[in-house]
Amino acid sequence: MGKILSRGLLALYLVTLIWLVLFKLQYNILSVFNYHQRSLNLTPFTATGNFREMIDNVIIFIPFGLLLNVNFKEIGFLPKFAFVLVLSLTFEIIQFIFAIGATDITDVITNTVGGFLGLKLYGLSNKHMNQKKLDRVIIFVGILLLVLLLVYRTHLRINYV
């Protein structure tokens, strides 16, 4: 699979994460800035968020870990893991600075766990499947999921706006 396709998918996934985490899948990006209330929780797993939200945070970062491995095989596990952690922390800091939603250490932890699982899942899968085939499967499924997300959001917007 070409580097252009895999790097393009990683870039699209990063944009999707930004859209999802910071802008809550809103088409009107400015609407998230109407929140005007800062909320900061530094005690893990105690905020008013529900269990489902924590699971969702883990799930949305698993593909990110997978795509980091597809695109940056020459970089070791720890730098990629650190990047996932820093990205998640950056999202939460941006949410706090601009008063977008709630800033929660639990989100940093669950996002990072998701990225960790993606990184490890790739390593485990790589032991049982040819690397090129694994990369193709990840890229194909990634493209399919991004298309489904866009169709889902477009459908919601058309039918419910």
From Swiss-Prot:
One of its GO terms (biological process) is response to antibiotic. It is found in: Secreted. GO terms for cellular component: extracellular region. The keyword Transferase does not apply. InterPro entries: Teicoplanin_resist-assoc, VanZ-like. Keywords: Antibiotic resistance, Cell wall biogenesis/degradation, Plasmid, Secreted. The keyword Transcription does not apply. It comes from the Bacteria. NCBIfam families: vanZ-A. Unknown. Confers low-level resistance to teicoplanin. PANTHER family: MEMBRANE PROTEIN, MEMBRANE PROTEIN-RELATED. This is Protein VanZ. It comes from Enterococcus faecium (Streptococcus faecium).
